[in-house]
């Protein structure tokens, strides 16, 4: 049983790394994605995002974290394999300021990735503005959205929404 779980975990990590490599090496014009996650399972989100963030850390650009209240710990950044000298954080922002800051940061081209926490769904106009900003700055933006744990018998709601012209 343990061996089976270990193989699945290794396969998931390998797939996440391959996906991260492909995304980081692709010539993208910008990307906005929403990551819905369960706060009770942070390791799952880390398995998906960390390989990509590590790859983006190889670029000369910054990584910007717009966090609601929590501060990133230096120990976590280092243990996650992220470049401490390229990670910037701004915390305790209200949602509208967070959205506007994310748009401005993406547009500059100074950041390889901008990560922000928002609880409400985006309007079509907000999503359009973010997408245009990401394309202009050739950057990736991740909107982190915590979801409530599902009730027993409910379908899990956590997931990754990747908005791309290739699929739409």
Curated annotation (Swiss-Prot):
Region span, FtsZ binding: 105-111
Gene source species: Cronobacter turicensis (strain DSM 18703 / CCUG 55852 / LMG 23827 / z3032)
Protein's job: Component of the SOS system and an inhibitor of cell division. Accumulation of SulA causes rapid cessation of cell division and the appearance of long, non-septate filaments. In the presence of GTP, binds a polymerization-competent form of FtsZ in a 1:1 ratio, thus inhibiting FtsZ polymerization and therefore preventing it from participating in the assembly of the Z ring. This mechanism prevents the premature segregation of damaged DNA to daughter cells during cell division.
InterPro entries: Cell_div_suppressor_SulA, P-loop_NTPase, SulA_CellDiv_inhibitor, SulA_enterobact
Subunit structure: Interacts with FtsZ.
Gene that produces this protein: sulA
One of the protein's GO biological processes: negative regulation of cell division
Domain of life assignment: Bacteria
Entry similarity comment: Belongs to the SulA family.
Keyword DNA damage attributed: yes
Region of interest (Lon protease binding), ranges: 161-168
Site (Essential for degradation by Lon protease): 168
Keyword terms of this UniProt record: Cell cycle, Cell division, DNA damage, Septation, SOS response
Entry PTM: Is rapidly cleaved and degraded by the Lon protease once DNA damage is repaired.
Protein name: Cell division inhibitor SulA
Phylogenetic classification of the source organism: Bacteria, Pseudomonadati, Pseudomonadota, Gammaproteobacteria, Enterobacterales
PANTHER family documented for this protein: BLR3025 PROTEIN-RELATED, CELL DIVISION INHIBITOR SULA
Reported induction: By DNA damage, as part of the SOS response.
């Amino acid at each position: 049983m343990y061996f089976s779980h270990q193989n699945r975990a290794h396969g998931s990590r390998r797939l996440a790394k391959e996906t991260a490599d492909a995304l980081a090496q692709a010539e993208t014009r910008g990307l906005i994605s929403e990551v819905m996650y369960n706060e009770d399972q942070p390791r799952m989100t880390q398995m998906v995002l960390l390989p990509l963030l590590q790859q983006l850390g190889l670029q000369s650009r910054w990584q910007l974290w717009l966090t609601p209240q929590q501060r990133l710990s230096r120990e976590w950044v280092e243990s996650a394999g992220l470049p401490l000298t390229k990670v910037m954080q701004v915390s305790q922002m209200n949602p509208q300021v967070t959205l506007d800051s994310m748009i401005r940061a993406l547009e500059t081209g100074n950041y390889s990735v901008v990560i922000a926490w928002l609880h409400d769904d985006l309007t079509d106009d907000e999503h359009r503005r973010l997408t245009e900003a990401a394309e202009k700055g050739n950057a990736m933006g991740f909107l982190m959205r915590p979801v409530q744990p599902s009730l027993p018998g409910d379908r899990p709601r956590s997931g990754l929404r990747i908005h791309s012209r290739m699929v739409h």
